């Protein structure tokens, strides 16, 4: 999501609900750069914004074991397709394994890709539950900080 998309997305609820603050819960690593624009967005809207990146920070490699395990706990992943998931030629975005330019430009992406290449991807329901609980606790803390 880009800055130009965030402002209109928040403008109507800000006005209609008379919001003073929001917690934006990010679930996609590609949205992290929006943090660079939060002060401008806050000033434009007169709205306090907390950017919660817990899910992205704790899930591990993109489409890897952590993300897939959380998806299974939430009921949005299909375990029967797990074998197909690790065909990196067909799905280069899994773990970012096949995205060479991204791997060359970002050590964190390359580290995650190496992890997926070496360990593969699996479903671990306990891990998924633990990650979701941790993310939820962090989100609740952010909401509580707005209420203080």
Segments predicted by a language model, with ranges:
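Extended, histidine- and acidic-residue-enriched regions that form the cofactor-binding/catalytic faces
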Residues: 1-21, 27-148
């Amino acid at each position: 999501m880009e800055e130009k998309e965030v402002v209109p997305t928040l403008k109507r609820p800000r006005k209609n609900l008379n919001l003073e603050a929001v917690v934006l819960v990010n679930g996609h690593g590609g949205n992290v750069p929006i943090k660079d624009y939060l002060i401008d967005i806050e000033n434009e809207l007169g709205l306090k914004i907390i950017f919660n990146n817990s899910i992205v920070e704790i899930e591990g490699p993109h489409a890897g074991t952590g993300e897939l395990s959380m998806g299974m706990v939430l009921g949005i992943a299909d375990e029967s397709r797990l074998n197909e998931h690790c065909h990196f030629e067909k799905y280069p975005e899994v773990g970012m394994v096949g995205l060479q330019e991204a791997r060359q430009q970002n050590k964190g992406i390359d580290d995650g890709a190496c992890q997926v290449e070496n360990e593969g991807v699996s479903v671990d329901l306990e891990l998924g539950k633990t990650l979701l609980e941790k993310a939820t606790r962090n989100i609740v803390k952010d909401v509580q900080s707005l209420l203080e």
